[in-house]
């Protein structure tokens, strides 16, 4: 009889563990050496049932999470693959505590759920020319570092386009961009981590030469097209 009761308890408790849903707006802090860094996470399920999210921290607002994994009460997520956060939801689902990996260090964090998720829709651009649509690669020289950037612009049915820029050497950080094209002139505004780009597309449609600007600093940036 005792074994049957224990089995019943296990069967009853298993669905409760699976039902834990981290959707919502979370606010907390990461314990850095000598100080705390405040940050916020927004998590919500897509129509397909997958978990999506965004992080806001230190001047970055609503940066898309590249990965969100939930298993029972365990959760792991990141916007940069080299800066993952792993944690555990409290039994009442009101808090998440765990560790963040930053610059190779494991640092504790804690968050509390404060309300509903505040996710913004993916920004759309007007459709671009065939010469601009596609994948472009460039390299930034900044503060003694060489950072590879990848720009993708994809036209969508209905006359819109989706733009993204990937910082390859910063954990694959991927940010949405709003692209505006007027003839050979191309501008884009970077979302999440503010920045902008202005450039000129050459006659052959193989090179985009311009300047990337962030926090008042402008840096030359030339993109070349990936072969179609």
Indicate residue ranges for each PLM-predicted region:
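Sec-dependent N-terminal signal peptides
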Residues: 4-13
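Short beta-strand edge segments in extracellular beta-sheet folds
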Residues: 112-116, 224-228
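N-terminal targeting/docking segments
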Residues: 5, 116-120
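Central antiparallel beta-sheet cores of small beta-barrel/beta-sandwich binding domains
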Residues: 20-92, 97, 101-103, 120-203, ...
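Sec/Tat signal peptide C-region and signal peptidase I cleavage site
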Residues: 15-19
């Amino acid at each position: 009889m005792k074994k049957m009761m224990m089995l019943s308890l296990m069967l009853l408790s298993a669905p409760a563990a699976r039902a834990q849903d981290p959707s919502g707006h979370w606010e907390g802090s990461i314990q850095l050496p000598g100080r705390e860094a405040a940050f916020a996470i927004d998590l919500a399920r897509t129509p397909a049932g997958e978990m999506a999210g965004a992080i806001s921290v230190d001047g970055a607002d609503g940066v898309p999470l590249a990965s969100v994994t939930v298993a029972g009460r365990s959760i792991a997520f990141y916007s940069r693959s080299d800066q993952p956060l792993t944690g555990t939801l409290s039994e009442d689902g009101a808090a998440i505590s765990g560790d963040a990996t930053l610059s190779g260090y494991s640092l504790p964090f804690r968050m509390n759920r404060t309300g509903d998720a505040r996710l913004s829709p993916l920004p759309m651009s007007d459709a671009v020319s065939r010469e601009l649509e596609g994948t472009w690669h460039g390299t930034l020289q900044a503060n003694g570092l060489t950072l590879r950037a990848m720009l993708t612009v994809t036209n969508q049915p209905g006359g819109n386009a989706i733009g993204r820029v990937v910082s390859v050497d910063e954990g694959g950080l991927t940010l949405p961009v709003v692209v505006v094209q007027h003839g050979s002139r191309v501008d884009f505004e970077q979302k999440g981590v503010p920045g902008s780009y202005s450039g000129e597309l050459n006659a052959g449609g193989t090179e985009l030469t311009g300047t990337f600007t962030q926090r008042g600093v402008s840096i030359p940036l030339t993109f070349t097209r990936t072969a179609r």
